[in-house]
């Protein structure tokens, strides 16, 4: 993958807003020392996180909150 595009990532994530949230959380993990799941190739952390998402190495799980009755 020479360049990672938004379209590459949108195959794995439902919408652009969710993609931004997922990528930013992964960048924070990488910044704190998490090991990259793809070859970083001296890229910035943002590019590495997008490459991981496009490769299907990073995903998400939606959690629905249940309403509490008052």
Swiss-Prot record:
One Gene Ontology biological process: DNA-templated transcription
Pfam family, one: RNA_pol_Rpb6
Main function: Promotes RNA polymerase assembly. Latches the N- and C-terminal regions of the beta' subunit thereby facilitating its interaction with the beta and alpha subunits.
Gene3D superfamilies given in the database record: 3.90.940.10
Stated name of the protein: DNA-directed RNA polymerase subunit omega
One cellular component term from this protein's GO annotations in UniProt: DNA-directed RNA polymerase complex
Catalytic activity: RNA(n) + a ribonucleoside 5'-triphosphate = RNA(n+1) + diphosphate
Keywords from the UniProt entry: DNA-directed RNA polymerase, Nucleotidyltransferase, Transcription, Transferase
Protein family membership: Belongs to the RNA polymerase subunit omega family.
SUPFAM superfamilies linked: RPB6/omega subunit-like
Gene name linked to the record: rpoZ
PANTHER family: DNA-DIRECTED RNA POLYMERASE SUBUNIT OMEGA (PTHR34476:SF1)
NCBIfam families recorded: rpoZ
The organism's place on the tree of life at top rank: Bacteria
Keyword Mitochondrion: no
């Amino acid at each position: 993958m020479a360049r990672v595009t938004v379209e590459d990532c949108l195959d794995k994530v439902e919408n652009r807003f969710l993609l931004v949230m997922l990528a930013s959380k992964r960048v924070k993990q990488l910044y704190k020392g998490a090991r990259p799941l793809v070859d970083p190739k001296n890229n910035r952390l943002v590019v590495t996180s997008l490459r991981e998402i496009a490769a299907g190495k990073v995903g998400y799980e939606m959690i629905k909150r249940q309403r509490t009755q008052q």
